[in-house]
């Protein structure tokens, strides 16, 4: 389903278990949506950055098989969950559990704007200053998303979305959360 156009609506069916996988570029709104859903549902949240990278090391990737195993274990051990990240391969590890797949694709300028106004992420950076030091790299990363290849590219996300046979939603604008639309609240039931 495509929810581009006027203010986005999350039109979803009721699920006995809420399982949601959110995929998109840096700055697309993944963390905001995931936190919102997790806060209101009580479902555990997995930020894939915490799985993809070695803790307390800058830009040292965790072995892919270990990351995939962690995602599978997280999905298996929780009845309901929300996961979000910039990793098509890790998102695909969650798809056998038949979550709702949400692909946030608001465009480069919206992602750049969101990155510039991003609050401090203490689980990723020691300080807001340390986070801001990495901003030029992040903005370059966001811009290259549309032309690079590999698991963290627009083409890989689009292919993952297209191949998924479960419930899925493509958003070209951020979902409206304040106030939440009735459809979003139904998603939490």
Q: Predicted regions span which residues?
A:
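Glycine-rich phosphate-binding loop used to anchor ATP phosphates in small-molecule kinases
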Residues: 67-109
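Conserved substrate/cofactor phosphate-moiety recognition/catalytic segment
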Residues: 35-79
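The conserved Walker
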Residues: 26
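A glycine- and Lys/Arg-enriched "phosphate-lid" helix/loop adjacent to the NTP-binding pocket
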Residues: 106-153
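Conserved lysine of the Walker
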Residues: 30
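NTP-dependent small-molecule kinase module
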Residues: 5-11, 15, 40, 144-189
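Walker A (P-loop) ATP-phosphate-binding motif of ABC ATPase nucleotide-binding domains
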Residues: 19
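Hydrophobic anchor at the beta1->P-loop junction of P-loop NTPases
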Residues: 22
